[in-house]
Amino acid sequence: MHFESPIKRRHSRQIMVGNVPVGGGAPISVQSMTNTETCDVDATVAQIRAIADAGADIVRVSIPSMDAAEAFKKIREAVSIPLVADIHFDYKIALKVAEYGVDCLRINPGNIGNKDRIRAVVDCARDKNIPIRIGVNAGSLEKDLQKKYGEPTPDALVESAFRQIQYFDELDFHEYKLSLKASDIFMTVEAYRKIASQIDNPLHLGITEAGGLRSGTVKSSIGLGLLLMDGIGDTLRVSLAADPVHEIKVGWDMLRSLKLRNRGINFIACPSCSRQNFDVIKTMNELEERLDDITIPMDVAVIGCVVNGPGEAKEADIGLAGGSPNNLIYQDGKPDSKTKNETLVDDLERMIRKKALLKEQELANIIVKN
């Protein structure tokens, strides 16, 4: 299917997180956060590399102590992907990691301290050309805002953000992005919508503490999907109580589904029924596992019978339609070959990899010509 996305993205200014542009019409970047002990350098580096291999543009690392800041120095030297240092409570930690090549500083206005401390972080960031993320969170609002509103609300999140915006403007510092996160979908969406209409700074999207792999994926897909459909968002993190690699995969699935970015295989598969001529679920599981390394955008249809099989298969780069006695493989909308149930996964994998290689070569030729 070739229906174009109707989404018109919100205009925002652009900042650079390392070599990744955020805002200003740049592709929506996908990021995650390590959940290792930062002082365990080997484990943290290994996880960052796994996250990067999954397709991350940016990785955030928690820096809860000066020891972690010293570990960050070694981590920074070991990986090339842009790194964000997540700082809470102690502003001096931000000053320390700034010396070690961090690409962005995340500070929480609810716990970073008074204006003098914020000024120190801003002055350091300006000197070293490091952007800042103002990360407002419903679970850690300033005490006076908690008292004023009684509980976290969209307006409380927005007011917290504007306090920092005003002070950053007073300091003539504009290299920053914002996030206004809550675990409640409605609160988060309303807060982002309110602030998006009033400022042009890039926005980092997320539903904080969304839950485990299944529930967190659902919550994040609804909340972030609503905002992305509105054209709001310049970078995103799907927060899951799961392996961070899953956060990257879900984030890419969201962007692919909304036709905002494309990476890897877009599988179209039927849920299967008694009409299926092969085991659709088993086939899909095997294909997803085998083809996880492919990054070139492709559409692959796996349909178990002739009801919708030929129609869906014709719209895909590679399509499989169940049939008897043999199943039919389509390529670029045309019947290509027949395959038996016993060999269909191997046959599909071979054709998909060949097609992916051709697409990569075509893309390389286009780049060379330009």
Curated annotation (Swiss-Prot):
[4Fe-4S] cluster binds at C270, C273, C305, E312. GO terms for molecular function: 4 iron, 4 sulfur cluster binding; 4-hydroxy-3-methylbut-2-en-1-yl diphosphate synthase activity (ferredoxin); 4-hydroxy-3-methylbut-2-enyl-diphosphate synthase activity (flavodoxin); iron ion binding. GO terms for biological process: isopentenyl diphosphate biosynthetic process, methylerythritol 4-phosphate pathway; terpenoid biosynthetic process. The keyword Oxidoreductase applies. Its EC number is 1.17.7.3. The lineage of its organism: Bacteria, Pseudomonadati, Pseudomonadota, Gammaproteobacteria, Oceanospirillales. This is 4-hydroxy-3-methylbut-2-en-1-yl diphosphate synthase (flavodoxin). It comes from the Bacteria. Pathway: Isoprenoid biosynthesis; isopentenyl diphosphate biosynthesis via DXP pathway; isopentenyl diphosphate from 1-deoxy-D-xylulose 5-phosphate: step 5/6. It is an enzyme of class 1 (oxidoreductase).
